[in-house]
Amino acid sequence: MAEKRRGSPCSMLSLKAHAFSVEALIGAEKQQQLQKKRRKLATEEAAGAVEDAGCSRSGGAGEHGCSEADEEAAAPPPAAGAASGPARSCADAERSCGSRGAAGSCEDGFLQGASPLASPGGSPKGSPVPGLARPGTPLPAPQAPRVDLQGAELWKRFHEIGTEMIITKAGRRMFPAMRVKISGLDPHQQYYIAMDIVPVDNKRYRYVYHSSKWMVAGNADSPVPPRVYIHPDSPASGETWMRQVISFDKLKLTNNELDDQGHIILHSMHKYQPRVHVIRKDCGDDLSPIKPVPSGEGVKAFSFPETVFTTVTAYQNQQITRLKIDRNPFAKGFRDSGRNRMGLEALVESYAFWRPSLRTLTFEDIPGIPKQGNTSSSALLQGTGNAVPATHPHLLSGSSCSSPAFHLGPNTSQLCSLTPADYSACARSGLALNRYSTSLAETYSRLTNQSSETFAPPRTPSYVSVSSNPSVNMSMGGTDGDTFSCPQTSLSMQISGMSPQLQYIMPSPSGNAFAANQTHQSSYNTFRLHSPCALYGYNFSTSPKLAASPEKIVSSQGSFLGSSPSGTMTDRQMLPPVEGVHLLSSGGQQSFFDSRTLGSLTLPSSQVSAHMV
């Protein structure tokens, strides 16, 4: 009877183990029915409910009973030997369940669990083994945030030289500015993006000019109050941050420790490094511009070695200065090529609407123009083989490489001109004169006549066309139309490749502005004739002292105001009187030529310099 009592618990456990092994081969529903039947059978074979309960409560007694039963059954039948393996698993399961408490809980946990000795061929459909294995598999780790510096090449160029950042009391923006691109954020999570600037070391620096290097000058100054720049778009979703370039261009640096504008406070002559912080919203409750960045699992900091800079109140390295001027769009005023020029011309040309469209014409490279004070000028003027009489030495001779010049007779106030035949073909490139059948030399005697007759040119245009060199010609063609009398004189000069126009100054008809005995203030009229039919004029006054001396006017005035095609006053240089095209006269006022629009014009006694602009 005692053996039966001792063996009954183990037999019950072996039956349970056998039921467990069957569970791996049959469906869950059939296995549950089989378990119920075997439970009823086990309760009938048991001696009493008290002994069964005691065995189930005391895991140690059950273990010893089970093990003793296994030892006594040294030579069991083959079926019993086959069940020995599940019996060991049962014992192991009861050891684990013994610490849990009641027998029912242990039994349920054992029945619902998966046996490690299940068939190696795999469990069939509906087996709980795969279902229990799925929750145990590790989930893929979320992608870590990543920050990329934008404009890294420019930062590296500055870093190679030694980046410097200006700091002021009012605050100065950084250049280059911190611009980053963030990836790896949760699109649906809210984030703060912030930036602070921390010291690189505890040293103070100075710049050595002869070696162009920064050297340690001592220990750093006392720490400044911490400041954090929170991006204005914070907080925002990860999707918003990842689809844009995050710029900190509005961040300002200051050396004012009492600053209340939210600027980053730094010491001058110290090295600092910016840091970009990515902070989850649930971790950014303590985020403040005047407090350090909170630390925690949801806070990530990123820094870049090429963004290290030295704070200065004025740039020390000239290479840094030039690089910032060249690359900073807000420093374009320092890139003006004319910033070192002086005078009115630099001031006028700094504005686009004041700039003239054409340059002043000079005759420095034309060998036919005589120089003042030259003793051999008479020989140059008195050429042979020309239609120009020697009695008029003011006219140029037909040298092989000279260009036409236009003058007025000294006693007639008439326009004198040379025919293109007087100027032979020149070997200089670009100087091509078109010969016309109507020669201007035929009109020379009429121009030098003392009578005050009106010169009417032929209907066909008889002007000289010049290809590229700065030779000038006069437009003599005209059409029928009403003529009018003009108190000033104008010439129509044409230069190939430029707008055909002549600008010069003529005194007013009230009197000779160059007379020595004139005491009142005279006025000068500036004309520009745009061939064929556009006339512009401006009037400006001169002082009596300058009017008394024509040489003084020419020598003292380095420039005069002239008209531009847009109608504005421009600053142009005045040539010496003998280097320009002159209009000379000493006689009375005479009508001397017709133009297409001016008709009959009169010329007062004067000496002026004409300039092409």
Curated annotation (Swiss-Prot):
Keywords assigned by UniProt, alphabetized: Developmental protein, DNA-binding, Nucleus, Repressor, Transcription, Transcription regulation
SMART domains: TBOX (SM00425)
Source taxon at top rank: Eukaryota
Renumbered ranges of motif Engrailed homology 1 repressor: 18-28
Cystine connections: none
Annotation: DNA-binding region: 149-336
Keyword flag Cell membrane: no
Keyword DNA-binding: yes
Main location: nucleus
Gene Ontology cellular component list: nucleus; RNA polymerase II transcription repressor complex
SUPFAM superfamilies: p53-like transcription factors
Complex formation: Homodimer. Can form a heterodimer with TBX15. Interacts with GATA4 and NKX2-5. Interacts (via engrailed homology 1 repressor motif) with TLE3; this interaction represses TBX18 transcriptional activity. Interacts with PAX3. Interacts with SIX1.
Reported function: Acts as a transcriptional repressor involved in developmental processes of a variety of tissues and organs, including the heart, the coronary vessels, the ureter, and the vertebral column. Required for embryonic development of the sino atrial node (SAN) head area.
Name listed for the protein in its UniProt record: T-box transcription factor TBX18
Species in which this protein is naturally found: Mus musculus (Mouse)
